[in-house]
Amino acid sequence: YEILNYLLGIKISKQSKNSFYKGVFYKPETIIKIRDNISIFSNKKKQEFNNYFKPTKILSPFKLNIKYQKYKKIFDIFSKKIRQGETYQIKICTKYRNKSSINPINFFWRLMKSNASPESFMIRDKNYSIVSCSPETLLLKKGNKIITKPIAGTLRKSKKSNRSSALKFFRNNIKETKEHNMIVDMERSDLSRVCIPGTVKIDKEKYVEEYRHLFHYVTTISGSLLKGMTIKNIIKSMMPGGSVIGCPKVRTLELLNQQEKENRNIFTGSFGYIKFNKDMRFNIIIRSILNYKNTSEISAASGVVLDSAAKKEFNENFIKAKSLLELFK
């Protein structure tokens, strides 16, 4: 998240003892495609493989970085900025942290069984681990076609709810509709900076995707890239994703950086790959666990618009983090 701010010329002064790397880049030496169960044959000692499956150790319970009273103060400040016309929507981030060391392979396997998502990933490095069940595609490029799928709208599942009832809720809810329309317009604008005029279009508008604990309100947008657009041009135009920031993007980022006292680290950043033919795929890092320096961090953010209610948005952050928190039980 922090390095994406720098790309837009936005300075971030805040730091904390839990600050993570600004960016990590890998060049893969081996790519393995798994289509069925696998067996490992190696000259390495068994203990070397066992190190990949060390048990999770939980040393302290999770704590929320800001309580509701503090959240409400930030919410009220942003509500005033919205009334003054400085921003139209803004996403407030909260974090859950505990002291722990995790087995990322086990966590990822369990997460995929219970809450599989299209942009999921797992990284196990000697210094840190990341486990994510992100549902959001920020950027998918194949040839000269580019696609983004912003998510704006979240509904907690109940025993009686289904996709049809969720879609009816979103379409009849003025707040959710406003929020979704603003984010879609911003993502269309971001795409237009790098696409041939007239080619940016909505492929599928306002549909529902279903997950274990919630429903999401999604729109798919595409465009045809202008000739000469570089990887840097595309990344700078599209990142960070508007659906997890708010709009307008630059001013909203500035307002967030004034009130959020800790780095977001990986949260609302992006993970993905770039091929040698310049095709690429990047997600938005949400629904994720960062384990670094024996601390696990789970972040969530919900949107504030003119008619938002602080308590509802605060509780929505918990709903979004719930499936990840359950992994530690």
Show which residues each predicted segment covers.
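Extended alpha-helical targeting/anchoring segments
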Residues: 1-329
